């Protein structure tokens, strides 16, 4: 009987995850726990990092059976077949006010200038030995747009998706720490004190026409990005139409929350020890930081150029909001500007380049897809 008990226990042990647990699994479970701590205790993008971290822990449980058909395979399908990022964009569009951009269209140039971080990171990644597809997926981290980063990574470098997503969302949460030193380094105190004129009112007609025209023009120019831009602008049309409140509310709340859970958990599920624990992950994290700093620099420098051209009417600080971390980057512009001049209220001015950055990052992704093309699946 004792021998039968020993045999039974040995069988239980052999079937358990403990018997197949590797040092890599243990390290990645610890990474997941650290990310959970950062999200819950420190408030770093908790709505995104929490499910990513939990997905990371689940992915590193040996013999989890996730390769079998079931809910996890459905979630992974949504990640690898680019289902979730466009749905996230639908919710983002429903929550976005393009009024500041419509009122001051030249801020679209600031959103474009901030995309320099994407291409700086792309060239850096290629110099470090990444393929052009991998470098493109890494470069989009500089746009500070998690869904776009996941969308492009799934198409161009699915094996790097976990590292790219974690880098993108981690640095988005660190925008208040990364941007101010760059902003102060490349602006003078006099420039930071500039008070901008109040924006003009934007009519309902303009707000309704804007998403329709954006969809048509950008999609015709860059067909590969139609899914992202189309869903972003459809969500915004729900918001601005005035007769689609139920759809707008669903996109902003129920749908957005549901898809966020699926997208973030699925991203975490890609963070297996085999895929994550390599030198490429370290390079991606370093390149992501360079991309964020370069994007901030590009926006600020172009803001300085605009300031010189318009006779000192533009505060260069709003250029840093050209990265699409909405609305964190715009808030940072407001905080830095108000420290220099308590009478400064840059938030609405900064929202122009901030929402332009959302469009700019999607356009950058579409450009790379059109020029380079996705990897074969």
Where are these regions (language model features)?
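Juxtamembrane and boundary regions of transmembrane helices in multi-pass small-molecule transporters
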Residues: 123-132, 164-192, 298-311, 356-377
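N-terminal alpha-helical transmembrane segments of multi-pass membrane transport
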Residues: 1-70
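Alpha-helical transmembrane segments
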Residues: 159-177, 285-295, 318-321
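Alpha-helical membrane segments and immediately flanking helix-loop junctions
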Residues: 77, 81-82, 89-95, 110-120, ...
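Interfacial helix-loop-helix linkers and transmembrane-helix boundary segments
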Residues: 40-49, 67-75, 95-110, 244-253, ...
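Transmembrane helical segments that form the transport core of multi-pass membrane transport proteins
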Residues: 215-302
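Entry/N-cap segments of selected transmembrane alpha helices
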Residues: 33, 101-122, 272-299, 350-354
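Membrane-embedded hairpin module used as a gating/binding unit in multi-pass transport
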Residues: 167-243
């Amino acid at each position: 009987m004792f021998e039968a008990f020993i045999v039974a226990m040995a069988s239980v042990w052999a079937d358990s995850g403990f018997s197949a647990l590797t040092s890599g699994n243990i390290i990645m479970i610890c990474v997941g726990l650290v990310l959970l701590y950062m999200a819950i205790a420190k408030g770093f993008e908790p709505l995104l990092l929490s499910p990513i971290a939990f997905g990371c822990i689940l992915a590193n449980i040996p013999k989890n059976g996730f390769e079998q058909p079931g809910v996890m395979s459905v979630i992974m399908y949504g990640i690898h077949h680019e289902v979730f990022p466009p749905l996230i964009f639908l919710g983002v569009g429903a929550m976005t006010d393009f009024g500041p951009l419509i009122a001051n269209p030249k801020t679209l140039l600031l959103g474009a200038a901030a995309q320099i971080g994407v291409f700086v990171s792309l060239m850096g990644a290629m110099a470090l030995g990444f393929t052009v597809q991998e470098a493109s997926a890494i470069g989009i981290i500089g746009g500070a747009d998690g869904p776009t980063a996941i969308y492009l990574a799934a198409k161009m470098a699915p094996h790097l998706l976990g590292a790219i997503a974690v880098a993108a969302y981690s640095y988005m949460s660190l925008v208040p720490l990364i941007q101010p030193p760059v902003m102060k380094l490349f602006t003078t105190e006099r420039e930071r004190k500039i008070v901008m004129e109040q924006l003009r009112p934007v009519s309902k007609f303009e707000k309704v026409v804007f998403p329709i025209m954006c969809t048509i023009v950008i999609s015709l120019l860059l067909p590969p990005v139609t899914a992202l831009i189309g869903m972003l602008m459809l969500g915004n049309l729900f918001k601005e139409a005035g007769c689609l409140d139920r759809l707008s509310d669903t996109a902003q709340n129920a749908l957005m929350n549901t898809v966020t859970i699926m997208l973030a958990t699925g991203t975490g599920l890609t963070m297996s020890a085999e895929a994550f624990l390599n030198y490429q992950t370290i390079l991606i994290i370093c390149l992501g930081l360079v991309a964020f700093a370069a994007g901030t620099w590009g926006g600020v420098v172009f803001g300085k150029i605009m300031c010189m051209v318009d006779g000192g009417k533009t505060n260069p600080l709003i250029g840093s909001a050209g990265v699409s971390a909405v609305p964190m980057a715009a808030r940072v512009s407001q905080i830095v500007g108000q420290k220099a001049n308590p009478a400064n209220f840059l938030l609405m001015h900064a929202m122009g380049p901030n929402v332009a950055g959302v469009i700019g990052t999607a356009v950058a992704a579409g450009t790379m897809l059109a020029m380079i093309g996705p990897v074969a699946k």
